[in-house]
């Protein structure tokens, strides 16, 4: 999976990058702010973004809301020191919310969940884009024999 890591704390960002790389995923970009993260996502089109919440310029929740407007948004996993943003994160369509320092196993489980989710989404998109696919009949009405 292609991953963007966004955290304004260099040590936290480096730790996440190391765990991601050790797990066999590719870090395609690193960002220090929400604005940098949006730019990175638009240019790199990652599958997943690991996103801090409290950052300068634009916080992670605002960034996630902006990313959700993209035609192919990445799966969002928040990695933050603040647990009181969990509801806002879920409203921003996050699929994961981990507290710092992120436990390696929890992070890997969140990445696995995001990978599975993205695979399912890709299959649905391919079905929709397949010109040979039969049209879906959503409202079929039929008589029953009694």
Where are these regions (language model features)?
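A Lys-centered signature of the CheY-like receiver
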Residues: 100
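Two-component/phosphorelay signaling modules centered on CheY-like receiver
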Residues: 10-29
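Conserved sequence signature across two-component system core domains
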Residues: 6-7, 31, 49, 80
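Receiver (REC) domain active-site loop signature in two-component systems and cognate sites
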Residues: 53-55
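Acidic catalytic/metal-coordinating carboxylates
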Residues: 33-36, 59-62
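Active-site beta3 strand of CheY-like receiver
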Residues: 44-50
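Conserved binding/recognition cores within well-folded domains
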Residues: 112, 116-146
């Amino acid at each position: 999976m292609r991953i963007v890591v966004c955290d304004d704390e260099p040590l936290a960002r480096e730790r996440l990058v190391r765990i991601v790389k050790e797990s066999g995923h590719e870090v395609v970009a690193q960002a220090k702010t929400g604005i940098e993260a949006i730019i990175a996502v638009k240019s790199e089109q990652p599958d997943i973004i690991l996103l801090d919440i409290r950052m300068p310029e634009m916080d992670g929740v605002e960034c996630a809301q902006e990313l959700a407007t993209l035609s192919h948004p990445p799966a969002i996993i928040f990695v933050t020191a603040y647990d009181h943003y969990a509801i806002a994160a879920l409203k921003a369509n996050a699929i994961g919310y981990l507290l710092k320092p992120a436990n390696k196993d929890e992070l890997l489980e969140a990445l696995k969940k995001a990978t599975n989710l993205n695979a399912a989404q890709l299959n649905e998109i391919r079905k929709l884009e397949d010109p040979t696919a039969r049209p879906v009949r959503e409202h079929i009405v039929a008589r029953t024999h009694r």
